[in-house]
Curated annotation (Swiss-Prot):
GO terms for cellular component: cytosol. This is GMP synthase [glutamine-hydrolyzing]. Residues 7-197 form the Glutamine amidotransferase type-1 domain. Residues 198-387 form the GMPS ATP-PPase domain. The gene is guaA. Gene3D superfamilies: 3.30.300.10, 3.40.50.880, HUPs. Catalyzes the synthesis of GMP from XMP. Homodimer. ATP binds at residues 225-231. It comes from Bacillus cytotoxicus (strain DSM 22905 / CIP 110041 / 391-98 / NVH 391-98). Its EC number is 6.3.5.2.
Length: 512
């Protein structure tokens, strides 16, 4: 990548939040890259970054499987900011003391600033932060001072300003830390001296060049679903290589109401792309029959997608690349070399080993909100750019347990009602994601003076910036009532509607 902008390097020590750090920095207009903790000091030096951030991680610095870094990184003279595990690693390196806490601290805590280092410039003396750690620093390294404390953590923040070294035991990158963004800003601008200079125009310019260099005169097959991610991928690649791109739209029977027709109209007629539609509904349902495990469903759907593309590509000439809408969040949720796996993502963990294509994933360094900005920059209509996030496995992971046509129809119809009412209420831009799910449980009800024993539909609606963390949406009661009444009255075999009020973490946004 041509770097005409300042860069902050984030070292990955296994935290599920590590890519959030890079995301927060990009929000400030400063480019940030995530790299494995095994990167060498020489490699970092060659990148000429303005500063380094050590992410958190699930391990203990004294554990057998502890992650370490090249100790020469501390000799580069660059500002370093250690978060959670990163602070503990810094402490150990400089001779301080790290011990196991009496109990794991997880959740919100009140932080008290004791020393206003550059990290805490213009921040309140007390603030709510997000803790998630099992070890803590109990003895400062020489030359360091305590910056902040909390009730359960006497050294919640530390610094050695002469060497430009900083550490915090909490997670400023998580939205629950109320002044976390300001704290990271203080490091990026106040300590590292960065200037704003990275934006989506830069990304488009670099990515178009990269796509052309990678593809050359070869042909690309794009998995087009009509969702935000695949739509942006298709338009971006089409802008780069034109008719060298062929889009395949697979109707696997797991789509939302009216989606198949909408995709063909928008991309084939609107964007004048070469789009081939494949009706694979029977093929997918046959493979998924009797399958209840969510991981197995994801793998089957991911594999079947690739096999469908293989079959179709065999009919085409010279297809070398498969384009996918894999995002940063897909990769982190599927686990990296250091991150613990939460769930397999259809764009990451579901690919067969004998796949015939080379992958091209131009969005795999972007978060969802960045993809929307990119889509707008590319001239994609708002109705697509602001479309609800929809997973590759589609309604297949919104029907919990075994998938049947009856269950799919329940989710499809109830989801259409939910989306219609949310839009009518003017909440479609306020709520980050909303959908219905079918948990597969039945309950007793009374309809028309008769006893019923039918399904329960779950509503999931969350507010978020990038999908890494999320809070349940406070939908007005009257809107929820309309949605519930319509679903129970208009969708067959449903007699109960429930609303999911769980945040992420501890839950994920999707139910499977």
């Amino acid at each position: 990548m041509k770097k005409q902008h300042d860069t902050i390097i984030v070292l990955d020590f296994g935290s599920q939040y590590n890519q959030l750090i890079a995301r927060r920095i990009r929000e400030f207009g400063v480019y940030s890259e995530l790299h494995p903790h095994t990167i060498t000091a020489e490699e970092i030096k060659a990148m000429n970054p303005k500063g380094i951030i050590f992410s958190g991680g699930p391990n203990s610095v004294y554990g057998e499987n502890a992650f370490h870094c090249d100790e020469k990184i501390f000799e580069l003279g660059l500002p370093i900011f250690g978060i959670c595990y990163g602070m503990q690693l810094m402490t150990k390196h400089f001779g301080g003391k790290v011990e196991r806490a009496n109990h794991r601290e997880y959740g919100k805590a009140v932080l008290k600033v004791e020393n206003e280092s550059k990290l805490y410039t213009n921040l309140p003396e007390e603030q709510v932060v997000w803790m998630s750690h099992g070890d803590l620093v109990t003895g400062l390294p020489e030359g360091f001072v305590v910056d902040a404390t909390s009730e359960s953590c006497p050294i919640a923040g530390m610094s050695n300003e002469e060497k430009q070294l900083y550490g915090v035991q909490f997670h400023p990158e998580v939205r629950h830390s109320e002044h976390g963004n300001d704290l990271i800003k203080n490091f990026v601008f106040g300590v590292c001296g960065c200037s704003e200079g990275w934006n989506m125009e830069n990304f488009i310019e670099v990515e178009l060049e990269k796509i052309r260099e990678t593809v050359g005169d070869k042909k690309v097959l794009c998995a087009l679903s009509g969702g935000v991610d695949s739509s942006v991928v298709a338009v971006l690649i089409h802008k780069a290589i034109g008719d060298q791109l062929t889009c395949i739209f697979v109707d696997h029977g797991l789509l939302r109401k009216g989606e198949a027709e909408g995709v063909m109209k928008t991309f084939s007629e609107g964007f004048h792309m070469n789009v081939i539609k494949i009706d694979a509904r029977e093929r997918f349902m046959k493979k998924l029959k009797g399958v209840e495990d969510p991981e197995q469903k994801r793998k089957i759907i991911g594999n079947e997608f690739i096999y469908v593309f293989d079959d179709e590509a065999a009919k085409l000439e010279g297809i070398d690349f498969l384009a996918q809408g894999t995002l940063y969040t897909d990769i982190i949720e599927s686990g990296t070399a250091t991150a613990q796996t939460i769930k397999s993502h259809h764009n990451v963990g579901g690919l067969p080993e004998d796949m015939q294509f080379k992958l091209i994933e131009p969005l795999n360094t972007l978060f969802k909100d960045e993809v929307r900005v990119l889509g707008s920059e590319l001239g994609i209509p708002d109705e697509i750019v602001w479309r609800q996030p929809f997973p590759g496995p589609g309604l297949g992971i919104r029907v919990l347990g075994e998938i049947t046509e009856e269950k799919l129809e329940i989710v499809r119809e109830s989801d259409a009602i939910l989306r219609e009412e949310i839009q009518k209420a003017g909440l479609d831009r306020e709520i980050w994601q909303y959908f219905t799910a079918l948990p597969g449980m039945r309950s007793v009800g009374v309809m028309g003076d008769e006893r019923t024993y039918d399904y329960t539909v779950g509503i999931r609606a969350v507010t978020s910036i990038d999908g890494m963390t999320a809070d349940w949406a406070r939908i007005p009661w009257d809107v929820l009532e309309k949605i519930s009444v319509r679903i129970v009255n208009e969708v067959k075999h449903v007699n109960r509607v429930v609303y999911d009020i769980t945040s992420k973490p501890p839950a994920t946004i999707e139910w499977e």
